[in-house]
Amino acid sequence: MLEVLDMAPPRHQPAAGKAGGGRGHGHGHGHGGGGGGPAARKQPLQSSMAQPKAETAAATAAVAPPEGGKKCGGGGGRRRGGRGRGGRAGAGPGPGLAAAPAVVVAPAARAVIGPPVASKGLSFCRRPGFGTVGARCVVKANHFLAELPDKDLTQYDVKITPEVSSRSVNRAIMSELVRLYHDSDLGGRLPAYDGRKNLYTAGTLPFDAREFVVRLTDDDDGTGVPPREREYRVAIKFAARADLHHLRQFIAGRQADAPQEALQVLDIVLRELANRRYVSIGRSFYSPDIRKPQRLGDGLQSWCGFYQSIRPTQMGLSLNIDMSSTAFIEPLPVIEFVAQILGKDVISRPLSDANRIKIKKALRGVKVEVTHRGNVRRKYRISGLTTQPTHELIFPIDDQMNMKSVVEYFKEMYGFTIQHPHLPCLQVGNQKKANYLPMEACKIVEGQRYTKRLNEKQITSLLKVTCRRPREQEMDILQTVQQNGYEQDPYAKEFGINISEKLTSVEARVLPAPWLKYHDTGKEKECLPQVGQWNMVNKKVINGCKVNHWACINFSRSVQETTARGFCQELAQMCQISGMEFNSEPVIPIYSARPDQVEKALKHVYNMSLNKLKGKELELLLAILPDNNGSLYGDIKRICETDLGLISQCCLTKHVFKISKQYLANVSLKINVKMGGRNTVLLDAISWRIPLVSDIPTIIFGADVTHPETGEDSSPSIAAVVASQDWPEVTKYAGLVCAQAHRQELIQDLYKTWHDPQRGTVTGGMIRELLISFRKATGQKPLRIIFYRDGVSEGQFYQVLLYELDAIRKACASLEPNYQPPVTFVVVQKRHHTRLFANNHKDRSSTDKSGNILPGTVVDSKICHPSEFDFYLCSHAGIQGTSRPAHYHVLWDENNFTADEMQTLTNNLCYTYARCTRSVSVVPPAYYAHLAAFRARFYMEPEMSENQTTSKSSTGTNGTSVKPLPAVKEKVKRVMFYC
């Protein structure tokens, strides 16, 4: 086993500024002055990771803030067994942890009897109380209170014969059944149906089991077969009573598991009417009538819609309504659609092979209706495009194989003269018996969602449509609720569900911005951000890097050497002004190269520089890129980071021609952290005043998994983990990446073992490597772990926590027996639909410039989970559109954070993001993990997307092999190369 953890740690020196004292600036936030003060915290820590549990518990308790907002579930105080797996708070240690003696607390501490353990055997962290820090205010949330019905709900099994795969057809069958039998056999009941095998009623039906016969005329299925009447047998059989008692218990916090069945019933009931009115996609509904569709280009248009979901919250059941938009195929005549795709007049000349293939891809699977038969609007699904133009197409008209041309057939049969015989025909219906339809005789059917990848222009257009100011967004949501008319909804009435038409008013708090520390040689040594923003004027980075040896390569034909040289000099000067030691001259003259020669050019510049430096390293490469550079950016990053071991900074041509001080300042910040410097640190960090970070060596992780885009069936998913490499500053983050099975959400390489012929069983993985790296960087071993995990949906919480917490434990134990630092595991979510609005949009003191709620606004009541530890935090100032708060859910907490401590730490970290002088919307470690995962996509060789395997491939949980990514060079992965 690799021994890296047995030397006594040197006493740690903070980055800069006054370690220890430091001005308080009115901070403290109810944390008892930091719990023990700087002096107590700077004692040398025990060197062994096998530190006795009792001592750790005692040490942690010694620096705990005063009694008051501590953990419930056994009496408060900080204990290592705070939230063990399989029990409530205080119910004992988690796996791999020896039991620690409980800390004795005063009788005044609250004692709460926890609810029963979750049936899964693992309970998520209970809410420790509510936060109190910050200026109190009221915000409005797009949650609408739903009153629970007091009726019994009954579930019935449905079996339709012959079996139908289409939900819409199933719904049509059930609608016809209800129409025929509502007043008779169904006893006046109006059931809600999920479109599959479940039917729900308020109360019971007059029977336990019955079979019905329903006749339905087929809707056009696009195959071209004439519609006919079909007979279906529908068997309805009693299945179970859906008990709402457990849902009430869960909302009251007296039950651990959310009763999914009861929630599902209510969700289906409230979606029943919308399913009939709108196009349903996932949890959203779309219609061209909600707002006028906007053209996105290339034959697409945006449809406005709304998201709807029923959720259990502290205030009771809540209906979450949000606006959404997505791309639909514009219902154009096919000729017009083709003209938009090709961006030119297609009527006048034949299609080239390349254009024909492009059109075939765009039209395959699309439903069209014919326009040459008057009122007969038969529908067909396009299966392909003919290779020949229409005037060359012939087909047999009888068994004797007498042939007729398509042009003649349409003239004789329908009196339709084909105007553009040089264009190919659409092939529709069955491939074996192809039917030909002239493009000009077809129109695209309305309401077809576009599922392929959008191009950049379309994405920009769609974002413009969805970008609505908070006031407009709020009005749209309220209007949607009124249009949906839940009061008049016959299904809601039937089941006794009442929906409020008012946004929920929620008590919130605005957390104060943290003081930031800059270098003492700058005019401004400390800075207090205003409304989530500040700037670098009169400030110098707290730890400036040294760049002695750099080179520049110019891939832009339009940038002359003198222009490039002037830009590089300006950038070097800005780096110096910002506090870096930056050589004004490159190692070799600026080298111009063609983008298609990227690898050759990079290696040439690298080798030329090494020859000139006589054994010294080239430290930084600047690259000037054309504005539209295709794969060039990714190629540069891949070659520099996985082949040459070189840090690079790319700059676009438009910025070289139009040099702005703001741009140069931002680039200099990126260069500084890429080269190992620090831009700023929290004043509280270097003053040893951050609860549950400053008291003992603490490592903060961020993790994310990014998946390939829709349509990429075999590309691997990319997992990234970053971890802080400095303490107490927690500002520098090293990052590791790995490829794993397609759409695999669990991070496979957190901890791994493999057999080596020489060394036997070898242990490794990203957590282990980053723990070792922290020790090397700080001389300390982490005695506490805080893990921010991005990209996990609610349905995956349990699985992700179980797998990844276990991997963290194993990684720690592999370094030293009994090494189990306490872990806090927090899921970060941005893809939710909760929006927060100012209570009064006219009150400028309660909004930022964009009309959004103020940065630092936190909500942990009313719309949050009934009993678990979660909160919404809007940590950033809005720029355009409506801000989306991040949702943080603490799934596991052995460090016993109070609500204030977790919320304040998370908010303060959002001011340490290295790439800009703004607070960001997601906690930086999670943000960095996302950047690192995104960067790693560039490392994949083109053939990796073809799912090729190699002898060194790693195997995902579903058994598929994934080719590993090329390794990032050692000196690159030590720094924030992904910024």
Curated annotation (Swiss-Prot):
<dbReference type="GO" id="GO:0005737">
    <property type="term" value="C:cytoplasm"/>
</dbReference>
<dbReference type="GO" id="GO:0031047">
    <property type="term" value="P:regulatory ncRNA-mediated gene silencing"/>
</dbReference>
<dbReference type="InterPro" id="IPR036085">
    <property type="entry name" value="PAZ_dom_sf"/>
</dbReference>
<dbReference type="InterPro" id="IPR045246">
    <property type="entry name" value="Piwi_ago-like"/>
</dbReference>
<dbReference type="InterPro" id="IPR036397">
    <property type="entry name" value="RNaseH_sf"/>
</dbReference>
<dbReference type="Pfam" id="PF02171">
    <property type="entry name" value="Piwi"/>
</dbReference>
<dbReference type="GO" id="GO:0005634">
    <property type="term" value="C:nucleus"/>
</dbReference>
<comment type="function">
    <text>Probably involved in the RNA silencing pathway. May bind to short RNAs such as microRNAs (miRNAs) or short interfering RNAs (siRNAs), and represses the translation of mRNAs which are complementary to them. Plays a role in the maintenance of the indeterminate state of the stem cells in the shoot apical meristem (SAM). Regulates leaf formation through vascular development and may be involved in determining the central domain of the leaf founder region.</text>
</comment>
<feature type="domain" description="Piwi">
    <location>
        <begin position="620"/>
        <end position="941"/>
    </location>
</feature>
<keyword id="KW-0217">Developmental protein</keyword>
<keyword id="KW-0943">RNA-mediated gene silencing</keyword>
<dbReference type="InterPro" id="IPR003100">
    <property type="entry name" value="PAZ_dom"/>
</dbReference>
<feature type="compositionally biased region" description="Low complexity">
    <location>
        <begin position="54"/>
        <end position="67"/>
    </location>
</feature>
<comment type="similarity">
    <text>Belongs to the argonaute family. Ago subfamily.</text>
</comment>
<dbReference type="GO" id="GO:0003723">
    <property type="term" value="F:RNA binding"/>
</dbReference>
<dbReference type="Pfam" id="PF16488">
    <property type="entry name" value="ArgoL2"/>
</dbReference>
<dbReference type="Pfam" id="PF16486">
    <property type="entry name" value="ArgoN"/>
</dbReference>
<dbReference type="InterPro" id="IPR032472">
    <property type="entry name" value="ArgoL2"/>
</dbReference>
<dbReference type="Pfam" id="PF02170">
    <property type="entry name" value="PAZ"/>
</dbReference>
<dbReference type="GO" id="GO:0048366">
    <property type="term" value="P:leaf development"/>
</dbReference>
<feature type="compositionally biased region" description="Basic residues">
    <location>
        <begin position="77"/>
        <end position="86"/>
    </location>
</feature>
<dbReference type="InterPro" id="IPR014811">
    <property type="entry name" value="ArgoL1"/>
</dbReference>
<dbReference type="InterPro" id="IPR032473">
    <property type="entry name" value="Argonaute_Mid_dom"/>
</dbReference>
<feature type="domain" description="PAZ">
    <location>
        <begin position="333"/>
        <end position="446"/>
    </location>
</feature>
<dbReference type="Pfam" id="PF08699">
    <property type="entry name" value="ArgoL1"/>
</dbReference>
<dbReference type="InterPro" id="IPR003165">
    <property type="entry name" value="Piwi"/>
</dbReference>
<dbReference type="InterPro" id="IPR032474">
    <property type="entry name" value="Argonaute_N"/>
</dbReference>
<dbReference type="GO" id="GO:0004521">
    <property type="term" value="F:RNA endonuclease activity"/>
</dbReference>
<protein>
    <recommendedName>
        <fullName>Protein argonaute PNH1</fullName>
    </recommendedName>
</protein>
<keyword id="KW-0963">Cytoplasm</keyword>
<feature type="region of interest" description="Disordered">
    <location>
        <begin position="1"/>
        <end position="95"/>
    </location>
</feature>
<dbReference type="Pfam" id="PF16487">
    <property type="entry name" value="ArgoMid"/>
</dbReference>
<dbReference type="InterPro" id="IPR012337">
    <property type="entry name" value="RNaseH-like_sf"/>
</dbReference>
<dbReference type="GO" id="GO:0019827">
    <property type="term" value="P:stem cell population maintenance"/>
</dbReference>
